[in-house]
Amino acid sequence: MSSGATPSNVVLVGKKPVMNYVLAALTLLNQGVSEITIKARGRAISKAVDTVEIVRNRFLPDKIEVKEIRIGSQVVTSQDGRQSRVSTIEIGIRKKA
């Protein structure tokens, strides 16, 4: 998750309510995008998983599959110069053929 422009098929999960990210994912899928990636780090990881599960089970049952799940960590430098590791997750989902 590098800084800069975000690709149009990526939903970055943060501090907003889960349904905001569900709506963003559904909007992308309804616009014809066949694959999207849900990305989060730190405490937002559980919200990213919830987003995928809500899209997959409540809104588009039997139409979405999880393509891949990538986990990792990033080194983040705080304002006072300390470095810490933050966990990351990227969940790729796509429409079933």
Swiss-Prot record:
Post-translational modification summary for this protein: Acetylated. Acetylation at Lys-15 decreases DNA-binding affinity.
Entry keywords, A to Z: Acetylation, Chromosome, Cytoplasm, DNA condensation, DNA-binding
UniProt-listed Pfam families: Alba
Localization per Swiss-Prot or TrEMBL: Cytoplasm; Chromosome
Keyword Cell inner membrane part of the UniProt annotation: no
One GO CC term, this protein: cytoplasm
One term of GO molecular function: double-stranded DNA binding
GO biological processes: chromosome condensation
Annotated InterPro entries: Alba-like_dom_sf, DNA/RNA-bd_Alba, DNA/RNA-bd_Alba-like
Principal localisation: cytoplasm
Cysteine-cysteine disulfides: none
Residue numbers of N6-acetyllysine PTMs: K15
Functional description taken from the UniProt entry: Binds double-stranded DNA tightly but without sequence specificity. Involved in DNA compaction.
Family statement drawn from the similarity comment of this UniProt entry: Belongs to the histone-like Alba family.
HAMAP family according to UniProt: AlbA
Name this protein carries in UniProt: DNA/RNA-binding protein Alba
Organism per entry: Sulfolobus acidocaldarius (strain ATCC 33909 / DSM 639 / JCM 8929 / NBRC 15157 / NCIMB 11770)
The gene coding this protein: albA
